Amino acid sequence: MPSTAEDVLKFLKENNIKWVDLQFTDVPGRLHHITIPADEFDLESLKTGFGKLDGSSIRGFTSIYESDMVLLPVPETMTLIPWSPGVARVLCKVFWGGGKGRFERDPRFIAEEAEKYQTEQGYTSYYGPELEFFMFDKVKLDVSAPQSGTGYKIYAREAPWSDSGTFVIRFKEGYYPAPPVDQLMDVRVEIVDTLVKYFGYTIEATHHEVATAGQGEIDFRFSTLVDTADKVQTLKYVAKNIAAKHGLVVTFMPKPIYGDNGTGMHTHLSLWTKDGKKNLMYDPNDEYAEISQFGRYVIGGLLTHARALSAIVSPTVNSYRRLIPGFEAPVYIAWSKGNRSAVIRVPAYYRGMEKAKRIEYRPPDPSTNPYLAFAALLMAALDGVNKKIDPGDPVDENIYHLTPEKRRQLGIKELPRSLNEALDELESDKEFLKPVFNSSILDTYIDLKRDEARSLQGYPHPMELYYYLDS
C-alpha cells in the first residue's frame, strides 16, 4: 500500500484508477464517502486536502453557518475497490475549512490523540477485536407510517422459520457447524479473501457463531489503536459489499433476533513499553493467570469505569437487548481467568507466552464507533495504571448463577440496563477521558445519543400490542 503522496500518485497511475472514494467516519460511527475523479490528485491536493464536505449534513459535525470542511487522505489507507473496477478508496482526516486546523470532533482525531497520549506516558497498546455479524437473505421493514404501526420480518436460509427446504440451525446451536449446515461459509471466505488480497489484513479465523440465521465472526491480527479502528471500519464496509453482491444483507446491529445470542465485538487489549519490546501485562511468576500487577491495574481501571464506558462501547438502544443474562453476553462487572460470564476475561489458552498475554473486554458490540471505543478503553486502562486501581479478587464462578445476595457480598455490580442509564454514568464519570476527549466531542456525542434514545422511546413496540391490547 502507498505510504507517501508520491506513492499515491504512482498507485493511481499503475492501477489505471479513474475514480477515488474519499471515506470518513461520523461521530456515531457510520462510514461516509464522496467519489471524485482520480485526476484531481496531485502533490498539492494531497498536502492541502479536498474541500468537498458539507459538515452540516453529517451527524455530530458542524452547523450550517460553518459547514465548509476539508478531507485529507491518509496515504497508507489507499486501496483498490475490487468490486468496482477502476475505483480506489482512501480513508481521510477531517479539517475545518478556512485553514482553521483539525476538526476536533473527527473520531479518527480522537484516536490519534489517544495514541499520542499513551506515547507521552511511555506505552503502546494493541487491540484485537472479534467482529460478529448476521448475514440475512432479506429484511422487510414496515416503518413508512409509524402512526398505524411498525414491523419487520427477517428472511434467513439457516433459520428455524425458514422455508428454504435445507438444513436449519436451531437457536443457540450455531457454533462451528460444518457445511452443509453452515450454508454461508463460502461468502465469509470471500470476505476474508478480499480483506487479505486487497486490504492487507492478516486473518486469524472466520467461523459460524452461536446464533442461528447466519451469524458469523471474523478475527484479524491485533494492531495499534488507530490502525485497528481503521480495520474495523474497513471490515464492515467489505463484508456489507461482498454480501450485497450475493444478494445478502450483513448487519452489525447487536440484537436483531429475539431468543438467540446477540452480536458482540469482544476486544482484546494489551499494553507494552513504548518501544513495543516488553508486554507489561505479563508476569511469568503469577500463578493465577500470569498477569502482572500492572495488568491488574489495567483491569482495575476498566472495571471502575465500565458503567461509563458502556455509553461508548454499547452505544445504541438495541445494544441493551444484547446485554442480558443467558446469551453469553457480559452483565456483571468482574474479572476472571477464562470466564466468559465476567466483563473481563484473562485468556488462559497457554502458559509461558509473553506475546499472547492480554485481557478481553467483553461488553463492546460492533455498532460502536471503533475510534472512540478503543480510545476510551485505553483511557480507562491508563487511569487504572496511574491511580493503581486494584481490581479485587477474580471471580471463578458462573456469575449468572450467583444469587443477588452472593453478588452483593462479592461487590459485583451490573452494567447499565439501558442507553439512557449508560449516558447518565458517562456524564457523571468522564474525567478519565478528558486528557484525550475534548468537551466538544463528549457533549456532542451525549446529545446525539440522548436524542436517539428519546426518539425510539416514542414508538410503541409491536409486542406491546400483543401484551396490552386487551387492557
From Swiss-Prot:
Subcellular location: Cytoplasm
Gene3D superfamilies, per database record: Glutamine synthetase, N-terminal domain (3.10.20.70), Glutamine synthetase/guanido kinase, catalytic domain (3.30.590.10)
Record's keyword annotation contains Nucleotide-binding: yes
Keywords: ATP-binding, Cytoplasm, Ligase, Nucleotide-binding, Phosphoprotein
E.C. number(s) listed in UniProt: 6.3.1.2
GO cellular component, one term: cytoplasm
UniProt-listed GO biological process terms: glutamine biosynthetic process; nitrogen utilization
Domain GS catalytic: 107-471
GO molecular function, one term: ATP binding
Pfam family, one: Gln-synt_C
Enzyme kind, highest EC tier: ligase
Record comment: activity regulation: The activity of this enzyme is controlled by adenylation under conditions of abundant glutamine. The fully adenylated enzyme complex is inactive.
Modification type O-AMP-tyrosine: residues: 400
Reactions accelerated catalytically: L-glutamate + NH4(+) + ATP = L-glutamine + ADP + phosphate + H(+)
Residue ranges of every copy of the GS beta-grasp domain listed in the record: 15-99
Matches recorded under PANTHER family: GLUTAMINE SYNTHETASE, LENGSIN
Family label: Belongs to the glutamine synthetase family.
Protein's name according to its UniProt entry: Glutamine synthetase
